[in-house]
Amino acid sequence: MPALRKHPHTATKHLFVTGGVVSSLGKGLTASSLGQLLTARGLQVTMQKLDPYLNVDPGTMNPFQHGEVFVTEDGAETDLDVGHYERFLDRNLSGSANVTTGQVYSTVIAKERRGEYLGDTVQVIPHITDEIKRRVLEMAEPDEDGNRPDVVITEVGGTVGDIESLPFLEAARQVRHEVGRENCFFLHCSLVPFMAPSGELKTKPTQHSVAALRSIGIQPDALILRCDRDVPESLKNKIALMCDVDIDGVISTPDAPSIYDIPKVLHREELDAYVVRRLNLAFRDVDWTQWNDLLHRVHEPRETVRIALVGKYIDLSDAYLSVAEALRAGGFAHHAKVEIRWIPSDDCETDVGAATALSDVDGVLIPGGFGIRGIEGKVGAIRYARKRGLPLLGLCLGLQCIVIEAARSVGLTEASSAEFDPDTPDPVISTMADQRDAVAGEADLGGTMRLGAYPAVLQKNSLVAKAYDATEVSERHRHRYEVNNAYRERIAESGLQFSGTSPDGQLVEFVEYPADVHPFLVGTQAHPELKSRPTRPHPLFVAFVGAAVEYNNGERLPVDIPAIPTADHQSNGAEHALEDAPARG
């Protein structure tokens, strides 16, 4: 009889998180919260998301379908769950943290074209699954500082039973076989619905979901039971029996007051203790010092400020997930609750619309985006905030709209961006030189923007330098357009200052009005929201929310709302809107 393979106890452990019954159960937040708990126990944790869609990355996907694109330090366009991972682990992840079917197939087909398979018939098993395994196991390699992770948490996207997810689940099963069962843990998230007519919680969907998982060779080690209420012990015992899972591994996770409470929910159910015990991990007790302070700020704010987020994708809040989280974190720094008002940018196109939408807020945020739809509304919101002394922060496209509004205020009435109006006589926002082929349709759109971390130099004593408490910073970017340097002097006549540039001075990275002109009107070409953490809020958001708090506590000027146009005038406006619709996209 052959000897059994031995696996070192010091090996990196792999923990897979799967989901069943329905999507949107919160696998990403569950995985992130468990990662936070293990980190608080002194373990080195890294995370990865396996996405079963055929897109190479989400960079060209519709925000209404996918939500935001989260950009990593190394310039990868990744799933929004990677943002959750970074915020809960409080560490930067690389592009390898997100694997898609499109990436896997592209790599395998490229290898086949190079002849690396030596004439083999290329198949899903073993070639696709081997490539998935390679990417999962690579996460266990030492980082740039030479630190090898104790635990790799891998979230498998999709729902058990989906055709698209099968290769990833098979690869996960094979990883368990290769690294050893004692070094691998499967956590399955399932729904326990409450049937109001009968007043009962139903376990059958979970039983069927686990049966589907077991049919492909995976026995879960623990179950996350998602419900709108606590699952009683009697039902937990029933599920443990029917799904062949230890009772200690059946975890009730009722809806939490906030996402920051989820680690406490999991810890109360002793999931983290069960995981470290099953994986034979060295650990210490959870250090709650930092997280308890966060929860105190979340649940016991001293005041509330209202921030208007003026965007074009507000029907799906996930399209601005990192922005919303950065705003809330900025509030935590001031012991303030940030109440986000989701304002469709089209509502602010007119002075009447902007005054109506923004009259009762303490600050305005203009997020990034693409395309012409809603641009005039963003410009209108900026004009209103500038004239009212209302704190405003513009991100990426938000900076570009600030520049357009400033240019129009000094007589360049047709100033616009080459993105929205290629024929504008005053393109104050122009296409970056290395992006012209992509914009012209002569190069790929996906993965070709100015992506990832880039440095910037800030003017001494500027608002942004004071916010950062530094004159050299690095932020993540995702854009193809830039401020046209030919218009800098003319735009400066408005009072707008170019307070931060690339180190060579050629690319505008930050703009602002001086403090004696406006209390806080700042724009950045970057996406600082991507580096904000709940326990370490981004300084730019801290400064912005701080300005909103001061505005809220100050004496407001009366709002002069322009008269509402007559019915005839409104009708004509509607006709013009219909005429513009095809061009606006």
Curated annotation (Swiss-Prot):
Ligase recorded as keyword: yes
Enzyme class: ligase
Reaction(s) this enzyme catalyzes, per UniProt: UTP + L-glutamine + ATP + H2O = CTP + L-glutamate + ADP + phosphate + 2 H(+); L-glutamine + H2O = L-glutamate + NH4(+); UTP + NH4(+) + ATP = CTP + ADP + phosphate + 2 H(+)
Residues the record lists as binding UTP: S23, K202, T203, K204, P205, T206, Q207, K238
Residues holding ATP: S24, L25, G26, K27, G28, L29, D81
Active site: C396 (nucleophile), H527, E529
Annotated EC: 6.3.4.2
Amidoligase domain: annotated segments: 1-281
Name of a matching Pfam family: CTP_synth_N
Molecular-function GO term, any one: glutaminase activity
Binding site for L-glutamine: G369, L397, G398, L399, Q400, E419, R480
Coiled-coil intervals: none
Amino-acid positions noted as binding CTP in the UniProt annotation, renumbered to this chain: S23, D162, I163, E164, K202, T203, K204, P205, T206, Q207, K238
A GO biological process held by the record: 'de novo' CTP biosynthetic process
Region (Disordered) location: 564-585
Domain called Glutamine amidotransferase type-1: residue spans: 306-554
Annotated control of activity: Allosterically activated by GTP, when glutamine is the substrate; GTP has no effect on the reaction when ammonia is the substrate. The allosteric effector GTP functions by stabilizing the protein conformation that binds the tetrahedral intermediate(s) formed during glutamine hydrolysis. Inhibited by the product CTP, via allosteric rather than competitive inhibition.
Keyword Heme listed: no
Residues that bind Mg(2+): D81, E155
Pathway(s) this gene product operates in, as recorded in its UniProt entry: Pyrimidine metabolism; CTP biosynthesis via de novo pathway; CTP from UDP: step 2/2
Tree of life domain: Bacteria
Further remarks about this protein from its record: CTPSs have evolved a hybrid strategy for distinguishing between UTP and CTP. The overlapping regions of the product feedback inhibitory and substrate sites recognize a common feature in both compounds, the triphosphate moiety. To differentiate isosteric substrate and product pyrimidine rings, an additional pocket far from the expected kinase/ligase catalytic site, specifically recognizes the cytosine and ribose portions of the product inhibitor.
General function of this protein: Catalyzes the ATP-dependent amination of UTP to CTP with either L-glutamine or ammonia as the source of nitrogen. Regulates intracellular CTP levels through interactions with the four ribonucleotide triphosphates.
Official protein name in the record: CTP synthase
Originating species: Mycolicibacterium gilvum (strain PYR-GCK)
Source organism phylogeny: Bacteria, Bacillati, Actinomycetota, Actinomycetes, Mycobacteriales
Annotated gene: pyrG
